[in-house]
UniProtKB/Swiss-Prot annotation:
A cellular component annotation (GO) from this entry: extracellular region
Coiled coil: none
Record's protein name: Enolase
Gene Ontology MF: a single term: phosphopyruvate hydratase activity
Provenance organism: Bacillus cereus (strain AH187)
Cellular location(s): Cytoplasm; Secreted; Cell surface
Amino acid sequence: MSTIIDVYAREVLDSRGNPTVEVEVYTESGAFGRAIVPSGASTGEHEAVELRDGDKSRYLGKGVVNAVNNVNEIIAPEIVGFDVTDQAGIDRAMIELDGTPNKGKLGANAILGVSMAVAHAAADFVGLPLYRYLGGFNAKQLPTPMMNIINGGSHADNNVDFQEFMILPVGAPTFKESIRMGAEVFHALKAVLHDKGLNTAVGDEGGFAPNLGSNREALEVIIEAIEKAGYKAGENVFLGMDVASSEFYNKETGKYDLAGEGRTGLTSAEMVDFYEELCKDFPIISIEDGLDENDWDGHKLLTERLGSKVQLVGDDLFVTNTQKLAEGIEKGISNSILIKVNQIGTLTETFEAIEMAKRAGYTAVVSHRSGETEDATIADIAVATNAGQIKTGSMSRTDRIAKYNQLLRIEDELGEIAVYDGIKSFYNIKR
C-alpha cells in the first residue's frame, strides 16, 4: 500500500496553443505520476463538461484556472490518504464529489487529470509499465492504427467537408511494420499533392489539409499515394473516414449541407446512399459519425445498409458513455464505439465502456483529441484493454508521434508475445 500525500495541478498548453490541465500525484513511497488532459475541437453535445474560465482577457476565454483550482482546492483534500492503487475508489470519490451527471461542477478536465495521474503513480509504485498495471498479463495486443492523413472539417482551414480521411495498414505483420507502411504512404501522399500543385501544410492532427474538389477526390489522392508507396488498396491498406457529420448538419432544416461540394439539403437517406456509393468505389472499412449525433433513425438506416461490411463507429453518437452505448446496442445502431477518455472523465468509466462494447460484439477504438500533448497515456490504454484499434493522428506532429513511439516501445518490450491482429481486429464485420 502507498498512500497519496499530495495532488497538484497546473495550467499547461496543448498542441493548438490552448491551455489544458496537467496533474501530478505524489505518494508516501516516493512513487509519482503525471498526466495531461487532451481537448477536442468537434465535440459531442452529450460529452462530459470541459471546464473553461470564459475570461476573454486571458487566453481568449479558454483558460483552465478554475479547473486547476478545483483539483488543488477541492479534489486534492478529498483523495489525499487514499491508497494510490484504489483506482475505482478514487474515481468514484471524485464523481460523487462533483455530484452532477456530466461532471459540470468540477470539470471533466480536472477529474480526468487526477484519474490518469493516479494510474501513473500506481504503476510507478508497483514497478510495472502502465499498460501492464492496468491490463495485467493478458495485455499484449498492439492496436491497428487508423492514420488521419488528410484533415478537413473543423480540423483544417480548407474546403473539405469530412473531418478525417484515414489509412489502416491492416496487412502488416507487426505494429512496427504498420507504422512503416503508414509513414511511406504519408510521404507518398505529400509528393502526390505537391505534383498536383496542392497545399502540403498540415492540420490539427498532422494530416495534409489541401483544398479539394470533393470528398471523393480526397479518397482518390489517397489511393494514388498508396499505390505510389508500393502497396495495394484493399489488400495491404484500407481506408477509413471520420465524417463528423454533426459539424455540417443543419438543425433548422434537419438536412446535411456539404458546402465544399456545393451540395446542400441532403436527407439522412441521401447521405446513406452517398456512403454506400463511396464504399462500392473505394476499400473503405470504417466510417465514424456518418450522421448527426441525434439522428438515430439515420444511424439505424446506415447500420442496416452497411453494418455487416463496414465498421460504423459512434463518437459524438455515444461519447464514451455506457448509457448511450447501451441504448445503441439495444437499438442495433452502429457496431463500434470511439473511446475518448475526456468524453467521460475517468479511467474507470472508460474501461467500463470498452468492456460493454466487447461483450456486445462491438469494437472499441481508443482515440486522441485534436488538441493533444506529449502525454501518451492512451497508447498504454489501448494495449491494456486489448482494444485492437487506435486513432491518434498522422505521421507528423510530435503530439501524435508520441503515441506511436510509445506503442513501438511496448511492442519491443512485449517481444514474442506481442500480437498485431490487423484485419482480424475488425471482428464486427464480414470481409
